[in-house]
Amino acid sequence: MPLSQEESTLIERATATINSIPISEDYSVASAALSSDGRIFTGVNVYHFTGGPCAELVVLGTAAAAAAGNLTCIVAIGNENRGILSPCGRCRQVLLDLHPGIKAIVKDSDGQPTAVGIRELLPSGYVWEG
């Protein structure tokens, strides 16, 4: 299914974000997310040998700080023309927990961008029963 204009805009914004910073091992992925009220939030990962947040998690924090509410779609773009990157397992779990209705833009089997529900990417996510 073709991307909507809003979804295509997310790819453009994340690409512009990662291309706006110098090539670096410390900041190699940008993410953009769309809120239900139409705002777009961007961010980049912060690599450090002790660990660090992925770009998607940085965007979640930025959106939360702006009282964005529900996020409806998210994408990650790698530097050096790597294009769309699928969320890692940790990000999939966090997205499922915090925004269970969110879609992530990933590449389909033909390498084309497509937006899929987070539950499709993580059908058997961890459920804490505390």
Swiss-Prot record:
Key word Phosphoprotein present: no
Binding, Zn(2+): C54, C88, C91
Quaternary context: Homotetramer.
Protein name from the UniProt record: Blasticidin-S deaminase
Effect of E56D: Loss of activity
GO molecular function: blasticidin-S deaminase activity; cytidine deaminase activity; identical protein binding; zinc ion binding
Keywords carried by this UniProt record: Antibiotic resistance, Hydrolase, Metal-binding, Zinc
Gene3D superfamilies in alphabetical order: Cytidine Deaminase, domain 2 (3.40.140.10)
Residue positions of the active site: E56
Source species: Aspergillus terreus
Cofactor: Zn(2+)
Classification via InterPro entries: APOBEC/CMP_deaminase_Zn-bd (IPR016192), CMP_dCMP_dom (IPR002125), Cyt/Deoxycyt_deaminase (IPR050202), Cytidine_deaminase-like (IPR016193)
Effect of C91A: Loss of activity
Ranges for domain CMP/dCMP-type deaminase: 1-129
Family affiliation: Belongs to the cytidine and deoxycytidylate deaminase family.
Binding site for substrate: S28, R82, Y126, W128
Pfam families membership: dCMP_cyt_deam_1
